Structures are given as C-alpha cells and as structure tokens.
Amino acid sequence: FTYNFRLRSLTKYIAQMSMESNGKSINFQLQESPFSTSPLIWGGYGIESQHSTFQWLMQGKTETSCDFIGLDDGEKETLDSYEMLLSQVLAMSYGKEDKQQPYKSVRGNNPCSILKLNSLDLKSLGFLLAIYEHKVFIEASILGIDPFDQWGVQLGKQLALEAKSNKEFLKDYFSQIFLPKS
C-alpha cells in the first residue's frame, strides 16, 4: 500500500512485474514446480483502500503480509499521509479485542513492512524499484523458473482469440449463463 498520491500506481507496477515474472508453474527442468510460485500482489493507494481492503485485512480470516510505502519529506501533506501509514501498521500489528462486541475486534499480528522514503526523487524511486526487482529475481532463482519468458501470456491471448472466433461456442456458452430477454 502506498501512502503518497504520487506513488498511487506503484502497486500495479509491482503486481504486474512480480506475477507476470514468477506466476508460472513450469521450472527450468520443464517440470511442474512443487512449490507455489508468485505470491498474489495487490493493494492500492492507502487512503482509498481503507474501506475495502483494510476491512478484509483487519477482520478477515486470511493471514497475509503487507508492505506499506510512505514518504516523509517534512511537508504537511506527506506527513499526514505518513502518520496514517504508521497508524494502520500499528492497528494491523497489535489489533484490539472486544469480547462484548466481537464485530468491533481486529485480529492483529499481521506481518507488515514499512518502506519510508525521505524524498521522492529519481534516486529514491530507483532504489525502491530495485528492491522489488531484486525480490522478483531472487524468488525466480529459488523457484527455478525463468522470470523473463511470457509463454502463459502469449498462450492466453491465443486461446482467447480462438474462443472469440468460435461463434457457435460463444453463443451456446452465453445462452447458458445469461437470462433470456423478456
């Protein structure tokens, strides 16, 4: 989750890079990997994510780790965002139990990382991108997969085009899932 408006698209970039690179199941030996490959990467601009994603993170049953990325450059706007980032991390880390009203409880104990930038310039942005690029490379090395091929993406496009060109199949399929016009 990014807590600076200028970084709002970073999560999408990291997700695309990570899942496209390491979201494969075939390793260098042309065998199916015995391990789960790329983790699911998702998130968004922190302030906008609070009423959807954070509900799930704080009260849902799935445990997951989160990276929080913020900027603390001394400006009032970024300081407010950075304080919100720290507050969210504390809430997710420590939680709160309310036995009288359990729907007001937050599980806590969610592993969180904080990446704090002191400025948003080419050097700090490059450093931040390099962290995630290196993570993708190390994951691929451990998993024994090629992070640079895109066979699945290409095959998906080919299969979609084949399905699209099969008009009879599409007609039958959609007639089964959509209600007829009245």
Segments (PLM) and residue ranges:
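A SIS-like phosphosugar-recognition module
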Residues: 1-182
